[in-house]
């Protein structure tokens, strides 16, 4: 029997049962729409988590002293070459930022708290959450700004306000504890109070003068890390390989190594997406098979007549499957 005739019979049979076939088509549409929507929501959550991990002063790739991750202090800092610009062959660098990030104790007139003191170049911090903060008062003007900005929650706990002074105590590059007074330029509101309590920012040059090597006037300025944001996150391994060549004695790691918990959750989201897709498509497949069996069972006499009229068994099967 010509395949064209099989198609004609199949289409005619479809329109003989409009309610059943309409419900089946609606079920398929809902299953596909649900799978697409779930996949979109999961992917959105997954990449939002990636963005948050990267913007948390991490970047896609980071250069640090080899001992810094185990013992983060200025003793494990390094000198960045003057006028350094990261150039990675075949990989576009969307932005980069040198920083000093060390644990410190911050004291007001009434209270004290432990924080991460971060010396930054504000013009380069479009790669981190710092660029998205809302400030009360002023933000840091430039790399030489000797003031400090703290979180609104930290300011509340310290019982201080914009314009007042704070004393910061931290360990310098020579291993000695140093303290210095900073005037509060402003306070920032972040997405979570944990960020507001954890970080205090000042200009990078100010932090270098405060915590750097004072043994010689010609001592180079120090940083504890260089963070890079890539235009394509998937090229991070290429960037790591080339940066290890440029910084042979440093620890060069991507965000997955620096944020292992976020990396595991990112991978888990991939698995969850596949599981949900298989479950939805499995349910749809069972529904289709059930409908096919019901359609065959209610047409036993009709199919028997087709066989009696001489239609081969294989053609009957093909016609039902095509339908």
Residue ranges and their predicted role:
Residues 1-8:
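Short, membrane-interfacial amphipathic segments enriched in basic
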Residues 12-16, 314, 318-323:
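Alpha-helical transmembrane segments of multi-pass membrane proteins
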Residues 18-45, 267-302:
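Hydrophobic alpha-helical transmembrane segments of multi-pass inner-membrane transport and secretion
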Residues 35-116, 138-144:
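Hydrophobic, regular-secondary-structure patches
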Residues 72-79, 107-109, 114, 125-130, ...:
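Solvent-exposed, non-transmembrane alpha-helical starts
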Residues 99-100, 113-121, 135-205:
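Hydrophobic secondary-structure segments that place a key small or acidic residue at a functional site
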Residues 172-273:
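Mechanotransmission and gating elements of multispan inner-membrane complexes involved in transport
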């Amino acid at each position: 029997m010509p395949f064209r005739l099989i198609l004609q019979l199949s289409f005619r049979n479809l329109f003989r049962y409009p309610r059943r076939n309409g419900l089946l088509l609606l079920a398929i549409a809902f299953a596909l729409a649900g799978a697409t929507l779930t996949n979109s929501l999961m992917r959105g959550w997954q990449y939002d988590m990636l963005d948050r991990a990267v913007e948390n002063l991490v970047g896609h790739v980071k250069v640090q002293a080899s001992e810094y991750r185990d013992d983060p202090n200025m003793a494990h800092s390094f000198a960045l070459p003057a006028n350094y610009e990261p150039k990675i062959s075949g990989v576009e660098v969307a932005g980069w930022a040198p920083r000093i990030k060390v644990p410190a104790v911050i004291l007001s007139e009434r209270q004290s708290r432990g924080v991460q003191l971060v010396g930054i170049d504000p013009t380069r911090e479009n790669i981190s959450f710092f660029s998205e903060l809302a400030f009360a008062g002023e933000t840091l003007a430039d790399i030489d700004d000797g003031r400090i900005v703290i979180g609104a929650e930290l300011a509340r706990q310290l019982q201080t306000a914009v314009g007042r002074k704070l004393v910061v105590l931290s360990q310098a590059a020579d291993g000695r504890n140093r303290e210095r007074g900073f005037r509060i330029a402003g306070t920032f509101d972040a997405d979570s109070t944990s960020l507001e309590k954890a970080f205090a920012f000042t200009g990078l040059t100010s932090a270098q003068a405060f915590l750097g090597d004072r043994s010689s006037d010609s001592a180079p300025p120090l940083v504890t890390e260089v963070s890079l944001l890539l235009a394509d996150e998937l090229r991070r391994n290429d960037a790591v390989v080339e940066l290890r060549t440029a910084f042979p004695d440093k620890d060069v790691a991507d965000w997955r190594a620096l944020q292992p918990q976020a990396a595991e959750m990112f991978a888990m989201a991939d698995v969850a997406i596949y599981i949900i897709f298989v479950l939805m498509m499995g349910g749809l497949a069972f529904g289709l098979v059930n409908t096919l069996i019901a359609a065959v069972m209610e047409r036993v006499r009709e199919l028997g007549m087709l066989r009696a009229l001489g239609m081969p068994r294989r053609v009957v099967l093909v016609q039902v499957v095509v339908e």
